[in-house]
C-alpha cells in the first residue's frame, strides 16, 4: 500500500532508528537524468508524517550540491540519546569521492554542511555500509576491487580489509555482518561474494554460483544467523535470490525464484528475519520469506523498474523504493486502500485543464467527473502472515475436522488489588456444509457394518437416474448372489429360457424347455425350478427321440462293396485298410469332405484330431468360425483381444461361460482395458462393468475417475460407494488378496476421509481408511484422525517423556573412589529422541546406601546400588548382541567406551584378589548405562538373572530390563518352573534344557570369555530341591509389606569368589537369611536378596553349587482375572501359538513356541495388575487386530515401534517372545 510519494530521480536514505521524527534523505542520482534533463544536483531531507492522508511528503531542507550520488546512507554516528537530529549522511560520488554531511545543519539551513570529503577511490563509489556495532566504521567499495574501511573519528586515512581480489573487478555491494562486528562481505557483478575477517585482514571464504551466470546486484546478511546471507542476481537468465550458509558453502541453502527477470536490489528486515524485500526488472516488489521461499506480499507498483529499496529502521512496516520513472515511493506492508492515489490523479487532471477547452474551440467544458463506485473500494491486502512485531488481539481459523477456532483477548481481574491479566479464551465450533454427503456416507457405513449389501445395492438400483448407473449397481449386486456368472449373463441379455425357446423355434420343435435343459447341462447348472416329475418326463422324451433317430441308421445286415479303385474313395479305402488314418484324413480334407475327416480323426487319436481341427478351422470361413475355434481350442484370450468392441457384451458373455476361475479376472481386465482405450466415451464407461466382473478395484477407480466428474463431494461419494461394495464383494466371494491398496485408490480414500473429517465425522473418516496399507498419505491422515479423536495412533507412543532427566554440567568430576554420594532419587534416566547421552566419563547418578545395616527402602525405585571398591578397566559394549527373543535377529550396536564405575558404597568390604576374578569382566552396569540413551538408571533397575539373561550377549551388554519383577502380593510356595514365566524361573534347569530353549550365545551375561567352559553334568540327589524364588515364605515370614515391595525387583549376581568371606546380612525385619554364598558386588538388591547362580560366578571355579534345601509346603497361588477389555489379547495370542504348534514340524520351533506360551504369562500378570501404560496397551491391541487379519508384517512393524519408543523396563519381559511368535506365524503362514 503506497503511503507517500516524492517526484525525484534520486538515491535515498532513512534516518536512524533513534531519530524522531522519521526523515528520508534523497540525493540526485548519478545513474540517470530526470524528465527535464537538468544537470543540477541537490541533497534534500523529507519528513514522514503518516497522519497526513495526502501522498506528498513535506520537504524540510534542500542543499544544492555539485555532486551526483551512486549511494547514500545515514549513519547514527555521534547521535545523542535524546534522538535529536544528528548522525552523518554518507554519500558515494561518481568520481571516487566520499562526502560526509551533517543532516542537522542541512535542516537548519546552514551553508557549510560538509563534514569531510575524500577522493580515494577509483571510479564511482557504488557500495556503502555502516557497522551497527561500531557506528564510526564505514565500508566502501568501488572499481578495481577497491574496498576501504573508514573511521569517522579519523577520516584521513582508510584501511583495507586485505589484499585486493584478483582479477580486479567492480564492487557492487558491501555489507557488515549483523551478529559479528569484524565480518564484512562484498560482492561483484561477476557473481562472486567474498567474506572478510578484519581481525586477520584477509578473506576467509569466497562464495560463487557454479552456473557462472550470477551477476550480483544485492547482498544482505541474515539479521539473526551470523553465517547466512543472500545474494541477488540481475541476470535475466538467472533471476534468483540465493540464500547461503557459510558452514555449507558448496551450494546455496535455498534459492528463491519468484522474479521473472533480473533482480536489482534486496533488503532484509531487521525487525523480522522472515521478511525479505526484492525488486526486479519485472517491475515487481516482492516481500518473501527466505526460509520457505513463499511470497508473503507483492506491492502494488506501476510498470517501472525500481533500482533501490530500503526498510525504515524506526517503523518496521514502512519501506521506500526508488524507481527509474523519477519517483521515490513509500509503502506499508500492512495493506490499506489506494483510493487516495486515484483521487490525487484526478486532482492533477482537474488542476491542469480545469473547465477550459484544451482544443481551442472556445467553449467551456463541464466539470471533470469520474464514475462514482461507492460500493467498491480498492483494498490492498496485508501480508499473508503477521510480522514478528505484531500480535493479533483476535483471530479465527478453520482447523482440521471442520472446526472453526476463534480467540479474543479478554482482560480478567484476578483478585482485588492485583493487576489485570489478559487472557485469550479459545472458542471451537463445528461447521457442517455437506449434509447430503454425510447422510449417504452414514448409509454406506451402516450397510458395511450390517452386511446388508444386497439391500443396499437394490436401493441404489431403484434410485439410479441413468441406465449406466443402474447397470453398475446391478453388476455389483450380483457379486453377493449365488451363481454370479449366470446372473451376469442374464444382465448381458442371455437368459437360458429365452435362448431355449429361440432354438426350439429354429428347429421347428415345441419342446423349448427340453432344449434349454440340454444347453444348460453343457454351459451352466440348471436353476432347479422344475419338479422331479417334470425332469423324469423330459428325460423320457429325450430317450424316445434318440431311439427314433437311431432307426434311420443303415442296416448292417446287407452286403457292400469295398472299392480299391484309383479315385479318392479307393485311396481312402486303401489308407483305412492299412491303418493309415492320417493319410485318409488328408484325402478327405483334400476332397472337402470335412465331416468324414473329423470322424476319421476321432478314430486316429487326440493328436490327429487336434491337427484336423486346426486344418478345418483354417479352411472354414463362416461368421462364427473364430467363435467355434475359441470354444474348441479353449483360446478365449484371442477372442477378447481380437473381437470388435461393439460386441463387447458377447465377448464378456463367452468369458463368463467358459473361462476358468484362474484366468477369469485376467480376461475381464483385458477386455476392460481395450474398452478403456477406445475413443468412444460410451465404450469407456462400459469398461467399468468388466472391472466389476474381474473384481479389480484399482482399475475401476482409474476408469471411473476418467469417465466421471470428480470435482464435487457427491461425485466422490458415488465412487467410494462402488469401491467399498466391490472390495467387500471380492473379499467375501473370491480368493484374492484385497489388502493391497494402490496409489490411486489410496489417494481417493484419503480424499474421501479428508472430506468426512472436514465435516466433523472423524470416526467415519477413520473407519473408511484402509488398514493394510503403507501409503504415506493414508498413514499421515490416520495419524491426524487418531490425534483429532484424542487417542494415540495404534502402536505408537507419545514422544513426550514421562521421566525426569537430571542434567549434568560439563566438566563435572565423577565421584572419588572410597567416598559415597547421596543423589536425588530417580527411577529412570531418559533422553529424548535425537539428544545425545552423556559422554564417557560422566557417571549416571544412582541411589547409594551408606550403611549395609540400614533399613531397606520400601519403594521399588529406591533400590540400593553397590559398586566395586577398586578401579575397574573400562569395558566396551559388544559390537553385536542378540535380540531378547529367541530366534530374533541380531541388533547392531556400535562399540562405545563406557564410563568408569562410580565409587564404592561399602568402603569396609575387603579387597578380592584378582586371581579369583576375571580382570576384563564388566563390573557394574552403571557405566554402561551412562553410555546408553535407552537404558535404565544404574541405581534403579539391575539386569535380570533369570534364564532370559543368557540372551543378552557377551560381557559389556547393557542392562535389558527392569520389568522382570514378580506380581506384587504373591506369596507362598511357587509352582513348578515350567508353570512360571521365564522371568520368574530360577536357574536350576539343566544346561541341556537351557540350550534347547535359548538361541544365540549360550554364555550368561556375567560369564567371562576366558572361562567359556561347559560344566559337567552331575547327578541330582534325591533330596535336592531347586533354590526358591523370592516369592517363597522364607523371604517374608511375617508378610510385612516392606519386604513385599522388595520382592518385585530382580537381583543380579555379581562376581563370586570361593575364597572370600562376607559378613552376615540382615533383612529389614531383622530376620537373618541363611542361604548360599553372596556375591561381592551387585546392582539394585542387597546381597541377601540375590538368587543362587548355579552356573558359577565369573572368575569362580565351576564346582558343586547345588544346595540341599528342606522341602517347603506348597500353597496354591491365586491370580486376579484379566480385565474383560484385555482378555482378547490372551485369547488371540494363545490361539496364534496353538495354530503355529499345529503347523510346525520342526522340534526346535515347537520348543520355541512352548517357551513363548509360558513366558507370555508375564504379560498376562501385568494385565491383571494393570501396570502397563495405555500406549503399550493400545499397541498390543493393534498387534492383536493384525493377527486376526493375518497381517503379520504390520504386527511386526507395530511391535518394533512399541519397543523403540516405550520404556524398556515395561516391555522387555514379553515383547521379545511376542516377536518370536509373530515371526513364526509369518513363516508358517498360519
Swiss-Prot record:
Residues 866-876 have a biased composition (Pro residues). PROSITE patterns: WD_REPEATS_2 (PS50082), WD_REPEATS_REGION (PS50294). It is found in: Cytoplasm; Cytoplasmic vesicle, COPII-coated vesicle membrane; Endoplasmic reticulum membrane. Keywords: Cytoplasm, Cytoplasmic vesicle, Endoplasmic reticulum, ER-Golgi transport, Isopeptide bond, Membrane, Methylation, Phosphoprotein, Protein transport, Repeat, Transport, Ubl conjugation, WD repeat. A motif (ALG-2-binding site motif-2 (ABS-2),) lies at residues 841-847. Residues 930-940, 959-975 have a biased composition (Low complexity). Gene3D superfamilies: 1.25.40.1030, Functional domain of the splicing factor Prp18, YVTN repeat-like/Quinoprotein amine dehydrogenase. It comes from the Eukaryota. Residues 799-1123 are annotated as: Interaction with PDCD6. The modification Phosphoserine is found at residues 526, 531, 798, 1173. One of its GO terms (cellular component) is cytosol. COPII is composed of at least 5 proteins: the SEC23/24 complex, the SEC13/31 complex and SAR1. SEC13 and SEC31 make a 2:2 tetramer that forms the edge element of the COPII outer coat. The tetramer self-assembles in multiple copies to form the complete polyhedral cage. Interacts (via WD 8) with SEC13. Interacts with PDCD6; interaction takes place in response to cytosolic calcium increase and leads to bridge together the BCR(KLHL12) complex and SEC31A, leading to monoubiquitination. Interacts with KLHL12. This is Protein transport protein Sec31A. It comes from Mus musculus (Mouse). The lineage of its organism: Eukaryota, Metazoa, Chordata, Craniata, Vertebrata. The gene is Sec31a.
